[in-house]
Regions:
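N-terminal catalytic cores of secreted or lumenal carbohydrate-active enzymes
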Residues: 23-263
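Bacterial Sec-dependent N-terminal signal peptides
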Residues: 1-22
Length: 263
């Protein structure tokens, strides 16, 4: 009897191996059950130069076209939070809070001219401050030849004193009132009139429908601690959000507001 069981088990094992070794062919008819998906599901971040003196190259435009790019986020991330569209300036929290030129008008025009139909996303500023001038930048070139080091996050614009030991704690913080100005909900949504309104630049709002509601507000007390040393309560931030959102939608009913954008 024991031999019979052994033979049975061997035959069963051989049969299982034979069955499991069979090739299974699955045919998929890709023409069936197809559903449209948004062309904006795929995108890239910060691709278009906003500096007329250093434009996006022909090779870069060619690469984006060949990749099938349909959506590009162009607000500059951390540098979006204090962008002043009137003066075309922004404060750089990852580089001493220094203020440098950025021209969103130029970037939006180049995107529209070079890749018609591609959606470009810019941003509204909700923190309440925007860059006002370049006169109070920390002289990073004189300090160390503009070399990156662990202290680039120190708040040195506005007359600060560098802490040579590094880290993000300056010996003396700069005065943000020297390089920033107040920036209300009316101020930030005014770019919609500038781009789309009567007497404005007459940009195609259908290709600039998506707007980021600032950038990473959950870490403002780190990236923008010059004006927000304590993290705002969620309710306080949402009131800033709602104030700008209502004014933006009143000017541009078909606008698509995105965010809050978390870190």
């Amino acid at each position: 009897m024991k031999k019979k069981y052994t033979v049975f088990l061997i035959l069963a094992f051989i049969s299982w191996k034979f069955i499991s070794a069979q090739v299974v062919t699955i045919h998929v008819d890709a023409s069936q059950g197809r559903k449209a998906i948004s062309p904006y599901i795929y995108g890239k971040n910060n691709n278009i130069s906003d500096d007329p003196g250093s434009p996006t190259t022909a090779a870069e435009w060619k690469l984006m076209r060949e990749a099938g790019l349909r959506f590009t986020r162009e607000n500059g991330g951390n540098n979006a939070t204090k962008y002043n569209w009137r003066l075309k300036l922004s404060s750089h929290p990852d580089w001493y809070n220094n203020v440098y030129a950025h021209n969103w008008d130029y970037a939006a025009k180049m995107l529209s001219d070079s890749m018609p139909g591609v959606q470009g996303m810019w941003a509204f500023q909700l923190i309440g401050k925007a860059a006002s001038n370049t006169s109070h930048n920390f002289n990073d070139y004189a300090y160390n030849g503009s070399t990156w080091w662990s202290g680039v996050c120190q708040n040195l614009a506005g007359g600060g004193v560098a802490n040579a030991a590094g880290t993000c704690t300056a010996t003396t913080n700069g005065n943000p009132n020297l390089y920033l100005e107040n920036w209300t909900a009316d101020s930030t949504v005014g770019i919609l009139d500038h781009w789309f309104g009567t007497g404005g630049l007459n940009y195609n709002q259908n290709n600039i429908r998506y707007w980021s509601m600032d950038n990473e507000p959950d870490i403002w007390n780190s990236t923008h601690d010059d004006v927000m040393p304590a993290q705002p309560a969620a309710e306080a931030f949402m009131q800033l959000y709602f104030a700008a959102a209502k004014k933006a939608r009143a000017k541009f009913p078909n606008i698509k507001l995105c965010g809050p954008v978390p870190a």
